[in-house]
């Protein structure tokens, strides 16, 4: 019984360290690029939608997921996150979103809009 508790504790510790919900800890030091190991993350690529695709009253935007370079670390991170490669739909959720084209957070009433 004592060995069972030790094994379950070690398995839980390994699962928490590998889980993306607590941050992908890559190698020694942890974090994104904070150590000696590889950076593990799942990359999403936005595919433009046809029709009006601006604002909250718009068609959903398609998202395609892929690992970084198809490496084993990215595959393990995607597997742990239960994200399968394919096409995803993103529906509008009221929050702040960063957009590289605009250079500021949506929701702030300043700056020149790019669209």
Curated annotation (Swiss-Prot):
Localization per Swiss-Prot or TrEMBL: Secreted
Superkingdom to which the source organism belongs: Eukaryota
Any matching Pfam family: Chorion_2
Keyword Transmembrane helix: no
Keywords: Secreted, Signal
GO annotation (BP), single: chorion-containing eggshell formation
GO molecular function: structural constituent of egg chorion
UniProt cross-references to InterPro entries, sorted A to Z: Chorion_2 (IPR005649)
Assigned protein family: Belongs to the chorion protein S15/S18 family.
Name the record gives this protein: Chorion protein S15
Species, as recorded: Drosophila melanogaster
Gene, per the UniProt record: Cp15
């Amino acid at each position: 019984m004592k060995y069972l508790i030790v094994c379950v504790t070690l398995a839980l510790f390994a699962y928490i360290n590998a889980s993306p919900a607590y941050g992908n800890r890559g190698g020694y030091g942890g974090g994104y690029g904070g150590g000696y190991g590889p950076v593990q993350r799942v990359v999403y690529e936005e595919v433009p939608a046809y029709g009006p695709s601006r604002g909250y009253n718009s068609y959903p935007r398609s998202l395609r997921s892929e690992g970084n370079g198809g490496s084993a670390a990215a595959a393990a991170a995607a597997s742990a996150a239960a994200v399968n490669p394919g096409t995803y739909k993103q529906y509008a959720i009221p929050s702040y979103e960063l957009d590289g084209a605009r250079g500021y957070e949506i929701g702030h009433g300043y700056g020149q809009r790019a669209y």
